[in-house]
């Protein structure tokens, strides 16, 4: 559950969104990617964190949409944001508390749906071999610290990154250049 909880909190902490967000105002407006990227770089059309967790491994990343002329800068900003979350002192207690509260709220609201509860039971049985009660999940979330999130982010960045691009990719920085930026974590 350690990886799952850290991954979920980290995804919420990073957050993101688009320059236009359907579903009403206020969604993700306090997340790091919204505050530090979308409000500052108007050429970025969307910039969001994503994650998937499996038994003993997982996937965490950032996807972005931007015009071709801004893609090199956008990739640089994405790298900077990933490095920032792995750097002690760059994430505040307020940001972590907000991410924890948002994640807990989202999980509790989702568990009001019987379909989602059934999917969650199946996912936990397949992934962990048993189902943990919601109180266990809530306690794990509450116990996460800034040190836990920083250590988890460092662990994520210590693996070889994967990079995918589509569209007009002529101005996308080469993989080797991007990968080298994370060298200090390996």
Segments predicted by a language model, with ranges:
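A glycine- and charged-residue-rich anion-binding loop/surface
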Residues: 8, 48, 137
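Glycine-rich, charged/polar anion/phosphate-binding loops
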Residues: 33, 45-50, 148-150
């Amino acid at each position: 559950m350690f990886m799952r909880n850290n991954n979920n909190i980290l995804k919420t902490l990073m957050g993101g969104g688009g320059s236009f967000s359907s579903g009403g105002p206020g969604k993700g407006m306090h997340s790091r990617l919204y505050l530090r990227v979308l409000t500052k770089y108007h050429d970025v059309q969307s910039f969001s964190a994503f994650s998937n967790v499996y038994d003993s491994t997982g996937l965490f990343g950032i996807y972005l949409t931007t015009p071709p002329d801004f893609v090199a800068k956008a990739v640089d900003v994405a790298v900077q944001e990933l490095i920032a979350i792995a750097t002690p002192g760059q994430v505040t207690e307020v940001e972590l508390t907000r991410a924890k509260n948002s994640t807990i709220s989202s999980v509790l609201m989702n568990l009001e749906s019987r379909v989602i509860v059934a999917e969650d039971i199946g996912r936990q049985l397949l992934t962990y071999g048993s189902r943990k009660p919601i109180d266990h999940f809530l306690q794990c979330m509450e116990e996460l610290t800034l040190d836990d999130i920083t250590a988890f982010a460092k662990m994520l960045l210590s693996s070889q990154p994967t990079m995918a691009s589509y569209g007009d990719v002529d101005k996308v920085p080469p993989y080797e250049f991007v990968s080298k930026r994370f060298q200090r974590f390996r």
